[in-house]
Amino acid sequence: MSKDDVIQMQGEVLENLPNATFRVKLENGHVVLGHISGKMRMHYIRILPGDKVTVELTPYDLTRARIVFRSK
């Protein structure tokens, strides 16, 4: 799978879960599980409930996502 195959969407963090995972509600109303991308972990980007985030979904599993950006 190449990087071009991902689906980018906007969402809002609903709640924190253990192991740096989050429940994210997407713009279209779906709720997915999201984990923080590696660069966000390296730079200690904090994500709290209510934050607007950009997530990447793969076409293979639309219930899990990678959080790649936190909007201000």
Swiss-Prot record:
The lineage of its organism: Bacteria, Pseudomonadati, Pseudomonadota, Betaproteobacteria, Burkholderiales. One of the essential components for the initiation of protein synthesis. Stabilizes the binding of IF-2 and IF-3 on the 30S subunit to which N-formylmethionyl-tRNA(fMet) subsequently binds. Helps modulate mRNA selection, yielding the 30S pre-initiation complex (PIC). Upon addition of the 50S ribosomal subunit IF-1, IF-2 and IF-3 are released leaving the mature 70S translation initiation complex. PROSITE patterns: S1_IF1_TYPE. Residues 1-72 form the S1-like domain. Keywords: Cytoplasm, Initiation factor, Protein biosynthesis, RNA-binding, rRNA-binding. Component of the 30S ribosomal translation pre-initiation complex which assembles on the 30S ribosome in the order IF-2 and IF-3, IF-1 and N-formylmethionyl-tRNA(fMet); mRNA recruitment can occur at any time during PIC assembly. InterPro entries: NA-bd_OB-fold, RNA-binding_domain_S1_IF1, TIF_IF1. NCBIfam families: infA. CDD domains: S1_IF1. Belongs to the IF-1 family. It comes from Bordetella avium (strain 197N). It is found in: Cytoplasm. GO terms for molecular function: ribosome binding; rRNA binding; translation initiation factor activity. This is Translation initiation factor IF-1 1. Signal peptide: none annotated. One of its GO terms (cellular component) is cytosol. HAMAP family: IF_1 (MF_00075).
